[in-house]
Swiss-Prot record:
Residues at the active site: 2, 604
GO molecular function: carbohydrate derivative binding; glutamine-fructose-6-phosphate transaminase (isomerizing) activity
Subcellular location: Cytoplasm
Biological process according to GO: carbohydrate metabolic process; fructose 6-phosphate metabolic process; protein N-linked glycosylation; UDP-N-acetylglucosamine metabolic process
Top-rank taxon, per record: Bacteria
PANTHER family: GLUCOSAMINE--FRUCTOSE-6-PHOSPHATE AMINOTRANSFERASE, ISOMERIZING, GLUTAMINE--FRUCTOSE-6-PHOSPHATE TRANSAMINASE (ISOMERIZING)
Catalytic activity, EC: 2.6.1.16
UniProt KW Repeat keyword: yes
Role: Catalyzes the first step in hexosamine metabolism, converting fructose-6P into glucosamine-6P using glutamine as a nitrogen source.
Domain Glutamine amidotransferase type-2: 2-218
The organism of origin for this protein: Salmonella typhi
Primary localisation category: cytoplasm
Protein's recorded name: Glutamine--fructose-6-phosphate aminotransferase [isomerizing]
Amino acid sequence: MCGIVGAIAQRDVAEILLEGLRRLEYRGYDSAGLAVVDAEGHMTRLRRLGKVQMLAQAAEEHPLHGGTGIAHTRWATHGEPSEANAHPHVSEHIVVVHNGIIENHEPLREALKARGYTFVSETDTEVIAHLVNWELKQGGTLRDAILRAIPQLRGAYGTVIMDTRHPDTLLAARSGSPLVIGLGMGENFIASDQLALLPVTRRFIFLEEGDIAEITRRSVNIFDNTGAEVKRQDIESNLQYDAGDKGIYRHYMQKEIYEQPNAIKNTLTGRISHGQVDLSELGPNADDLLSKVEHIQILACGTSYNSGMVSRYWFESLAGIPCDVEIASEFRYRKSAVRRNSLMITLSQSGETADTLAGLRLSKELGYLGSLAICNVPGSSLVRESDLALMTNAGTEIGVASTKAFTTQLTVLLMLVAKLSRLKGLDASIEHDIVHGLQALPSRIEQMLSQDKRIELLAEDFSDKHHALFLGRGDQYPIALEGALKLKEISYIHAEAYAAGELKHGPLALIDADMPVIVVAPNNELLEKLKSNIEEVRARGGQLYVFSDQDAGFVSSDNMHIIEMPHVEEVIAPIFYTVPLQLLAYHVALIKGTDVDQPRNLAKSVTVE
């Protein structure tokens, strides 16, 4: 969602800030801005509605000079997208950027108005600027003012603040929204995502909940919310920003779809040894914890929730462990009963998804056996706060609609299933079949990608459609859910997914010649049941698009289009059948002319509730 970049150096920092914002564009935003202060305290602020490139053009026309600055990309929450609502916000000499939501901004706004402050935006962020300004007038340093202001704010936020009268210092505060400090030589940086700072440093300090940081060119001091100084470890990051060039591809999403064979190879690297899954990276005590697991609770949002839904079938059928999957935003707001020896698994590409993080923190109070995060970003909040963590190693994913992060999550989950089956003393053939399937998966997906042109032609049938229905059975039902999500995310076609057996319980009423029905139908034990559901659609004139392998015995007809897939091992079929649905959504979006990589109203990493 929103992105923050800050810098304090002996050189001009405007280009550092702009490059940082460019690297955060993938998170989604509607406006951008920056403010730079020189050594004499002269501040220049630029804000633009639209892309970072428009802000960069403005900076070329009006050069910004100064060694201290903060910048921001905004994803509108309070107040419409506009230049007036774009960050940074100013209250006299106080300049603020902010990620998150201040839940009590309205009473604070009224109180500040009563003190004589005038608001020029609709945002909750301007409340922070005026509140810090007010507290500073009551005496003390900027840090003192922030320490007094922070307890008055309710909600999740990450904020960076500068005082133009003291351009040698930046202050930052974290409560529920990530901030990371980048350490340089005679210069220091801060951002909401380490990707923004990779061009200038590889050394980072991740702020923890309640931290307040005071940053100068030569020092970083961190305090807790009482003002007591605390120590935070700095780490050397090996994260690679490898997505800057789309190469031969038109969009990042297309590139990331085609990267999946290699991404899955990376996920598997070092984790299969002598025909067994090797997850020794979990540490020496992991086996003891995992061997006690009698139940699994999975929390996730969006695409990650769909991967959790697939894994439920695997955990129960292959490892014999009961598994529940819940949307994180629902879990955290209801009373739940914790089963005996239940393992909490959280799934998140970014590791910063607000609701998933909140669910993890709640689980620590509820008595879960332990927690395991599956994530694509080392050092993220979810990873740091979990007992165990497994990285998907998918590489940077820029497209808002997740592709390779989803398939690599499933790959990690399936490896975990194999490990648990062994720890439970189940038949060794279970792990053997999983390992064999996973090793074959990259080449199977490469085979499937050769069908791209066929899927591109079929996508033309969707050019005038407003609705679509996806069907699947068993562990392919969550893949139907994921296919529907991809189509609605990037083509803006209303799409729903149902377990095929539910057709006659309502969705069948929607079927007519204008309703395309996409079916995921590998040749498995549920195929005959699924064929009956397909006939129900055919009998009512629905247009069918069936993804299946040749052994399934389907034949194309006027209203049934068969997209023949290579045969794959049953255990990896859910991962495999995801890819053609990604391609279908991509090509439909191209025909519709939408913004594939940054679809409207959506953000890559949802760091607010």
